[in-house]
Amino acid sequence: MVKVFIAGASAPGTYPISELPSRIRVGAGESIDIVAIVLPGASCEMPLTMDIDGEGAEVNLSGLYICGSEEKVTFDLNVHHNAGGTVSRQLFNGIAGGSSRAAFHGRIVVRQDSQKIKAFQENHNILLSEDARIETMPQLEIYADDVECSHGATTGFLNAEEQFYMRSRGIPEAEAKVMQAISFLSPVVARIDDEELRGAVAALVEDAVRSLSF
């Protein structure tokens, strides 16, 4: 089951992001699923090292961050594939407005004797103002040859063509932007497997997006 950690709000079934350990070891056949959420008004640093130590282990890390004013948010993630036949996935999406600062530092390390590895990392961001800044640094360090690994990062703005289309369908501009932002963040929310918890988190995210200045 996915564990959800939140900064800036709470919901039944979630945990404060401050309770997330800074280092987690994953043994053979074990699976860890974590979703980390940072909402407007919360500044935080999230250092996390995952040691994947046993064959058949799987790690899924997802997160979203919504910054609207002067928040400072940093994700510093290190995933170490210390055993063969292991899998890791990372998906982090963020929105920054005002004069906020966000950073995603993601590092995947595959040891030389760790073969048959699958490791994937994505970080996508949207800026809402000229003063907001997002730093993204995805990194792969691969010392084995039998691997399937990828990483990628994007930073941009809300899609004006999509807004134009929605406005042509009678959707007000402000609502079109809100819908775009929610859609952008929804792949992270969708990682939550419990339907009731997913709905509660989706409501928090929608409220947070509607509080932003577009």
Predicted regions and their residues:
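Conserved beta-strand/loop scaffold segments within soluble protein domains that form the structured core
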Residues: 1-164, 168-171, 185, 192, ...
